[in-house]
Swiss-Prot record:
It comes from the Bacteria. The keyword Repressor applies. GO terms for biological process: negative regulation of DNA-templated transcription. This is Heat-inducible transcription repressor HrcA. It holds the Pfam family HrcA. The keyword Repressor applies. Keywords: Repressor, Stress response, Transcription, Transcription regulation. One of its GO terms (molecular function) is DNA binding.
Length: 355
């Protein structure tokens, strides 16, 4: 907390961490007892008064102690982030909890989300990778009725996508099998985005003259791949932890937050905005968002913060996040989110085209 002197920093940190624990205004006696500073009662009150004047503390009632403002939490969190940035290795128990048990990507991410919610005692979210950068394991075409073909794509990591595509030529089953075999022989192990680009290049005349069967296979493959949108799963765990938070004890406020967590499209947007962050990132609502982003953020998130981190390396695949009250135990949550992010990066790097 370089913006403050050592005494002010120590006092403010003590108040913040006392408030995180108690959810109640913190008085000067509590600060004196917990800080270990040899300050007279008058000096302690003066220091707290100075912090109030600087906008780091507020007094909800004249007879009450002080509570930290969002400005104080931002200063506190930034200091913790600088400390956690020096930790490169994920704790062994996190690695063991996720390694080797979940070969399918969806199951792995559900496990990660559950692990984070259990340890953080907050709501956790994991935004799954979209299929565009997943590698193809197999593509099969199956007749699906008059003029229709079912394309079944199996991707590395166990993701499966199915799409119905038009078949105006009315190909037979044997032809569809040959088309699938051709595409698998040429493109297995490639990313869907790379396959799309390559097929479009071939069909537009960029490659050698194609045989009729090859052209038909590529045309059908192009239809199948172009119909695959970048739909993404969002795994949410720990909503019951809301009940344990003093901020949401009032029924109406709890319902607001629960409603916000049901707005999947908006949660996806919030997580997507943090996917290009270098490491663990903290967003306070509504203080850290403005303009269109503020209008899109669910109203129920006011007074909340989100700790998030991308996973996947240089080309991020998704985001892991924790949502809770601003009065969150950041000393626990920041390294937790960072550790799980690093483990997911290690586990998923080989299944996707990541750096």
């Amino acid at each position: 907390m370089s913006a403050l002197g050592s005494r002010e920093t120590h006092v403010l940190t003590t108040i913040i961490e006392s408030y995180i624990t108690s959810a109640a205004p913190v008085g000067s006696r509590t600060v004196s007892r917990r800080s270990g500073l040899a300050l007279s009662p008058a000096s302690m009150r003066n220091t707290m008064s100075d912090l109030t004047d600087m906008g780091f503390l507020e007094q909800p009632h004249t007879s009450a102690g002080r509570i930290p403002t969002p400005k104080a939490f931002r200063l506190y969190v930034d200091a913790l982030l600088r400390q956690s940035a020096r930790r490169d290795e994920a704790p062994l128990h996190m690695v063991e909890a996720l390694h080797g048990h979940e070969p399918e990507v969806g199951a792995l991410l559900r496990r990660a989300s559950n692990l984070v919610s259990e340890h953080a005692r907050q709501v956790s979210m994991v935004l799954a990778p979209g299929p565009a950068e997943a590698r193809l394991r197999s593509l099969d075409f199956v007749p699906a009725g008059e003029g229709l073909v079912l394309a079944v794509l199996v991707l590395e990591g166990g993701m499966v996508r199915t799409r119905l595509v038009r078949d105006d030529t009315h190909f037979g089953s044997d032809e569809l099998v040959r088309f699938g075999n051709y595409i698998n022989a040429h493109y297995r192990g490639h990313t869907l985005s790379g396959i799309r680009n390559s097929i479009h290049h071939e069909l537009s005349g960029g490659g050698a003259q194609l045989e009729a069967m090859c052209a038909q296979a590529l045309a059908l493959g192009s239809l199948a791949l172009d119909s695959i949108d970048d739909d993404r799963e969002l795994y949410v765990n720990g909503t019951r932890n809301i009940l344990d938070q003093a901020e949401f004890a009032e029924l109406g406020r709890m319902r607001e937050l629960m409603d916000a967590l049901e707005e999947r499209s908006r949660l996806l947007e919030l997580l997507d905005r943090t996917i290009l962050e270098d490491d663990v990132h903290v967003t306070f609502y509504p203080d850290d968002v403005s303009g269109a982003a503020q209008r899109r953020a669910p109203d129920g998130l006011r007074g909340c913060s989100m700790v998030s981190a991308p996973y996947g390396g240089a080309s991020p695949l998704g985001v892991i996040g924790v949502i809770g009250p601003v009065r969150m135990d950041y000393r626990k949550v920041l390294p937790l989110v960072g550790a799980v992010s690093r483990v997911l990066t290690q586990l998923l790097r080989e299944r996707f085209a990541t750096g």
